[in-house]
A protein has these predicted regions:
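Structural marker of alpha-solenoid helical repeat scaffolds
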Residues: 32, 64, 97-98, 132, ...
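Canonical tetratricopeptide repeat
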Residues: 40, 74, 108, 142, ...
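Residue-level recognition of tetratricopeptide repeat
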Residues: 34-35, 68, 102, 136, ...
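Canonical positions in the second alpha-helix
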Residues: 28-29, 60-61, 94-95, 128-129, ...
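TPR alpha-solenoid repeat register
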Residues: 37-38, 71, 105, 139, ...
Length: 422
C-alpha cells in the first residue's frame, strides 16, 4: 500500500472513530512507512485529539531517534495532555542547554508551571528563553499571556501592543481582541472599548460584541451597549449573558419597559439563571407589577435558597405590603435550612411585633442591634418597641445612639431627658 493510500485509510478510520481499525492500521503504518510520514501521522493524531495514539507514534520515533530534542518536546506536550506530567518533565529536562530546541523546551516547561499555579517559576523559564532569543515574538507573546493571567495587566498590555505592531495575530489569538480583554480586566473600560471596536472591524464575533457592550456599559455609554447587544442577539440568540446586560443597559436609560421585556426574553432562553429572575423581579417592581415581582423573586430563591440579594428583595416586598405572616414564614423557612443572616433580623423583629409575638420580636431586635447601630430607621422602631415593653434602661442606650448619629434631632434628647427624670 502506498503512503498516500495508507494515510487516506487512516484518515477515514479517524473520521469514523473506529478505534479497532485505527489500532490495526497503526501497527502496519509504524512498521512500513518512512519516519517523516510517521511524524506527520503523529501531528494528525494530535489535531484530532487522539493523544494516546499520538504518544504511541512519538514513542516509536523516539526509539528510532533517541537524541532528537524536538521529539522529546512533542511527546512531553502529549504526555501533559494525558496527565502524565512526571514523564513529560523528565523528557524536557533531558534537553541540553546548547540544543537549538532548548528555548522551546523552556516555553513548554513554563506552560506546565503556569498550569500548576507556579507563576514565578514559569516566568523565570520564559525569561531564560528570552535571554537566548530576545527578539523571538512568540516568547514575548508567551510572557504577555503569563502576565495577563497573573493580573499584571499594564505589563501585559505593553507587550501585546509591541507585538501588534508586528502582526495582528499570534498562536491563533487576535491581538486587538486580547488587548481589549486585558484593558477590560484591568478596569480601563474606555481603552478596552476602543480595542473591541477595532477588533470588530476585522471580525464580528459574539464574544467581541459582548466585550464591547460590557466595556461601553462600564463607560456609561449605555446606548452604545444596547446597540452592540441587539446586534449580538441577532447573531447568536443563545448568548445568554447578553440579556441581563441588555436589560441593565435599558434600565440605565430609564426605559424600564424595554428592560423588563429584555429580561423576560432572557428567561425564555435560560430558565435556570437566578440573576435573571432577580433582575426580572426588580424590573417588575419598576413597572408597577408587585405580584410578578414576588413571583420572580421566589423563583430566584427556589433556585438558590441562600441567594441573599433575592431573599432581601423578597422580604422587603412582603414587609412593605405588611404581609407579616408571610415575612415570618419565609424567615423561619430560611432558619430551618440553617441560613442565618443578620440583615433579615429587623424584618423579623417588626413582623413578630406586629403579630404580637413580643418575646420573639425582642429577641430579633436585640440580635439586629449590633449590626444596625448606624441605621436611624431601625433604631427608631427599636426604641419605641422598648418603651412599649417597659425596657427603659435599654431604651436609654438606644436613644443615646440615636442622639449620636442624629445630633440635630431634639426629639431623642427630649425623650432621653424624660426617662432620666422618671
Amino acid at each position: 500500500m502506498t503512503v498516500n493510500n495508507a494515510m487516506t485509510e487512516m484518515m477515514q478510520a479517524l473520521e469514523q472513530g473506529d478505534l479497532a481499525l485505527i489500532d490495526q492500521l497503526l501497527e502496519s503504518f509504524l512498521m512500513k512507512e518512512l519516519p517523516e510520514e510517521i511524524y506527520a501521522l503523529a501531528e494528525v493524531f494530535m489535531q484530532y485529539g487522539y493523544m494516546k495514539e499520538a504518544d504511541r507514534v512519538l514513542e516509536h520515533l523516539q526509539f528510532l531517534f533517541p537524541d532528537e530534542a524536538q521529539l522529546k518536546i512533542d511527546r512531553a506536550n502529549v504526555l501533559m495532555e494525558l496527565g502524565n506530567e512526571d514523564d513529560a518533565l523528565d523528557l524536557l529536562l533531558e534537553i541540553e542547554e546548547t540544543s537549538p530546541e532548548y528555548p522551546q523546551a523552556l516555553v513548554v516547561l513554563a506552560d506546565y508551571y503556569q498550569m500548576q499555579g507556579l507563576y514565578e517559576v514559569a516566568e523565570k523559564r520564559i525569561n531564560e528563553a528570552l535571554s537566548i532569543l530576545p527578539d523571538e515574538p512568540l516568547l514575548h507573546f508567551a510572557k504577555a499571556e503569563l502576565l495577563f493571567e497573573t493580573g499584571r495587566f499594564l505589563e501585559a498590555a505593553r507587550l501585546y501592543e509591541e507585538l501588534s505592531e508586528q502582526q495582528g495575530e499570534f498562536a491563533g489569538v487576535n491581538l486587538l481582541e486580547r488587548l481589549a480583554e486585558v484593558y477590560r480586566a484591568g478596569a480601563a473600560y474606555e481603552t478596552a472599548l476602543d480595542y473591541y471596536l477595532a477588533a470588530l472591524e476585522d471580525e464580528v464575533k459574539p464574544d467581541i460584541l459582548f466585550g464591547a457592550a460590557y466595556s461601553a456599559f462600564q463607560s456609561q455609554k449605555y446606548e452604545m451597549a444596547i446597540k452592540q447587544l441587539e446586534e449580538l442577539k441577532e447573531l447568536d440568540p443563545d448568548y445568554f449573558s447578553a440579556y441581563l446586560l441588555l436589560a441593565e443597559s435599558y434600565a440605565m436609560t430609564e426605559d424600564n419597559k424595554k428592560a423588563y421585556s429584555a429580561i423576560l426574553e432572557g428567561l425564555k432562553r435560560d430558565e435556570y439563571d437566578k440573576t435573571l429572575y432577580l433582575f426580572a423581579g426588580k424590573m417588575a417592581l419598576k413597572n408597577g407589577l408587585p405580584a410578578e415581582a414576588e413571583q420572580y423573586l421566589r423563583e430566584a430563591v427556589a433556585l438558590d435558597p441562600e441567594y441573599m440579594e433575592a431573599v432581601l428583595a423578597l422580604i422587603s416586598i412582603l414587609a412593605q405590603q405588611e404581609r407579616f405572616e408571610d415575612v415570618i414564614e419565609l424567615f423561619e423557612t430560611l432558619q430551618q435550612n440553617d441560613f442565618e443572616w443578620s440583615a433579615l433580623y429587623p424584618f423579623a423583629a417588626e413582623a413578630y411585633e406586629n403579630l404580637e409575638l413580643y418575646d420573639r420580636a425582642y429577641e430579633f431586635y436585640s440580635l439586629a442591634y449590633n449590626d444596625f447601630k448606624e441605621d436611624a430607621a431601625f433604631l427608631e422602631k427599636y426604641v419605641y418597641f422598648l418603651l412599649e415593653e417597659g425596657k427603659r434602661s435599654e431604651a436609654k442606650e438606644v436613644l443615646g445612639q440615636l442622639i449620636a448619629i442624629q445630633p440635630g434631632e431634639t426629639e431623642w434628647q427630649e425623650k432621653l431627658e424624660s426617662l432620666e427624670f422618671e
